[in-house]
Amino acid sequence: MLFLPEQAESVQPGLEKIDTYLTLSKLGCPVFKSALIKSDEPIENETICALQSYFKTKEVTVRYQYVRSSIHPVQGGNRYQLSLEAIAPLQNADTYLWLLEPIDRLKNEYGINLRFQSDQCCIEMVGRGFDVSDLNRGQISPHQTIITELPVRMGAYNEWWKFLKYSFATQEEYLLSIDRRMEKLTSMGYTVSRQIFCPQYKPLPIERLETLLGYITRISVHVDQDDFCVSASISDHHFIFWDIQTPVGKKRTYGVK
């Protein structure tokens, strides 16, 4: 079992999700701490005690790092009790278990998708109650879109906001996206009400946008790719970065200058 990102140097190469998570951590982007358990590692009471000591929580979010193809892929991102009875049955031969700090995706303040190209970054966002996966899978149109040049223009007097291009979903489009999100959540077994969503979309506050532009600058300088996406969220007033993708899927490794 490896505790990440602290033990990054011990991770075997070629683990797509883990590679991109560690790349973002290396660049100073905030990520959840996590633990990686191989498919052939026994999960025992001592394992659970070590995890409880590390996470200091009673629950974890479980994701899966596939190490071989599977005809029955398992959907990750769900929360489980950090107990032997809950975690041990999740282990299977096709995946490594990837346990992260718990997050309630229904309480996300924003889901953010960053599309990097050679000369610009397109920031797509959805609001409270939505998830960045809604954007990545094309299930929901963005509620707010911001385009910035690369490198980010700051201006002579730090008037960076003047150089951004903004667009927003209409109120009708926003309400329709709530209907679609509720349909998706119902199909996943969640029971939710419209109260988890804002009646109107609230644009990203300018101070958070300024922080995000700082991360964008850092990523654009150091990730050696021409066209890629970065997924992030804001939860409990904090940024969390998830992974990096290219248009043809996640790469095995990403070069860092």
Task: Specify the residue positions occupied by each region the protein language model found.
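Nucleotide/phosphate-binding sheet-loop regions of phosphoryl- and nucleotidyl-transfer enzymes
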Residues: 1-257
